[in-house]
């Protein structure tokens, strides 16, 4: 079940009038395969929804490609890293390439699908800076200009910033 809500009237102090609509959108997260799920967010979260996966993609964007580099950067257990790299390769966000035959060694590089995920990743970073920004934090800067990234999501059709207009989920026929 998915809960959708929308404000139906002006806010009066800390109170907002809410209509709550509960609808079935095929978002059963207990489904054995993500392809059964109608929601593209739910499908994506089946393999992108954990911190290790997102941090591996962050590090791949920063130029890390080898197992030991990811392990050192993240402090992740080898078995966990092996599983996450296998999933990211299977889901085609990373491509495994052999860089040495003796001994056989492989590296992992971002695919187009992995590069397409980067705006989402840096939006999460911007949200974290804004809402969890206490203490010292890394800054993400444009490599050419050195200016801080300030990512926003814009709807390509309307030009409106995502989050400034209502969004509905529409079930396919």
Describe the function of each predicted region.
Residues 2-24, 122, 126-173:
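C-terminal regulatory/oligomerization modules of transcriptional regulators
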Residues 3, 13, 17-28, 71, ...:
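Membrane-interacting alpha-helical segments
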Residues 22-45:
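Short, Lys/Arg-enriched N-terminal segment that forms or immediately precedes the first helix
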Residues 39-80:
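N-terminal helix-turn-helix DNA-binding core of bacterial DNA-binding proteins
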Residues 49, 100-121:
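Basic, amphipathic "hinge/linker" alpha-helix immediately C-terminal to the N-terminal HTH DNA-binding motif
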Residues 57, 65-70, 85, 117-121, ...:
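Extended, folded domain segments that form the structural surfaces/walls around functional sites
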Residues 67, 71-99, 103:
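Canonical helix-turn-helix DNA-binding module
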């Amino acid at each position: 079940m998915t809960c959708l809500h929308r404000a139906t009237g002006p806010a009066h102090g800390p109170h907002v009038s809410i209509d709550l609509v509960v609808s079935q959108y095929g978002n059963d997260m207990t489904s054995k395969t993500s392809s059964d799920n109608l929601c593209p967010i739910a499908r994506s979260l089946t393999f992108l929804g954990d911190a290790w996966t997102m941090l591996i993609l962050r590090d791949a964007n920063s130029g890390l490609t080898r197992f030991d580099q990811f392990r050192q950067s993240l402090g992740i257990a080898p078995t966990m890293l092996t599983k996450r790299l296998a999933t990211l390769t299977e889901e085609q966000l990373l491509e495994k390439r052999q860089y040495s035959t003796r001994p056989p060694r492989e590296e992992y590089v971002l695919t187009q699908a992995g590069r397409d995920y980067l705006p989402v990743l840096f939006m999460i970073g911007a949200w974290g800076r804004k809402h969890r920004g206490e203490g010292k934090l890394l800054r993400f800067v444009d490599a050419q200009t050195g200016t801080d990234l300030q990512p926003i999501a814009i709807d390509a059709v309307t030009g409106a910033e995502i989050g400034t207009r209502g969004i509905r989920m529409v079930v396919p026929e």
